[in-house]
Design a protein with these regions (language model features):
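Conserved, non-catalytic sequence blocks in retroelement Pol enzymes and Pol-derived host proteins
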Residues: 38, 81-84, 111-116
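Catalytic phosphate-handling regions of large nucleic-acid enzymes and associated NTPases
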Residues: 61, 70, 104, 111-130
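Non-catalytic, polymerase-adjacent accessory regions of viral genome-replication enzymes
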Residues: 1-44, 48
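Phosphate/adenylate-binding "loop-and-lid" substructures adjacent to NTP/NAD/dNTP-binding pockets
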Residues: 33-70
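Conserved catalytic palm subdomain of right-hand nucleotidyl-transferase polymerases, strongest
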Residues: 28-35, 80, 119-142
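Conserved pre-motif C helix in the palm subdomain of viral-like polymerases
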Residues: 76-105, 141
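Short, compositionally biased low-complexity segments
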Residues: 11-27, 64-66, 95-100, 130
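Hydrophobic face of alpha-helices
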Residues: 40, 47, 89-90, 94, ...
Length: 142
């Protein structure tokens, strides 16, 4: 592997591990209509195709399936459902980048972080509100 052109090596084993994580999460078929069970019927070829495209730098994600779900407050929210294949590719990226980036994130960052939730952010905010009796408010204009 030439490290100057490929900063991350993607092994076939990593793609397989990513698939098992995606399978455990279940999920609906994407725009291609392929379920996890259908994907698994041709697992070896499907995983090889993902690995080959990602390793060669020519992976391009397919479109997502738009699904509208109702909001509790009224109205609708549009969700984008990726294909099983794209979920595996996304998981590969997550598994490579998360251990590298997690240590450099700010300790006050809670969104989409492992072991952190919005409830954790609320608890820290509540604690800080009780510890301080002042607020700094400002607006930045260009």
């Amino acid at each position: 592997m030439n490290s100057s052109t490929k900063p991350f090596e993607i092994s076939k084993q990593l793609v397989l591990q990513a698939y098992y994580k995606v399978k455990a999460n279940k999920g609906s078929p994407g725009i291609d209509g392929e379920s996890i069970e259908m994907f698994e019927a041709n697992l070896k070829n499907n995983l090889y195709r993902i690995w080959n495209r990602m390793s060669s730098g020519c992976y391009f994600p397919p479109s997502v399936k738009a699904v509208c779900i109702p909001k509790k407050s009224g109205g609708m929210r549009v969700l984008g459902i990726p294909t099983v294949s794209d979920r595996v590719a996304q998981m590969v990226v997550k598994m490579v980048l998360e251990p590298i980036l997690e240590p450099v994130f700010d300790e006050d960052s809670y969104g989409y972080r492992p072991g952190r939730s919005s409830h954790d952010a609320i608890a820290v905010t509540r604690k800080r509100c009780w510890n301080y009796d002042w607020v700094v408010e400002f607006d930045v204009k260009v």
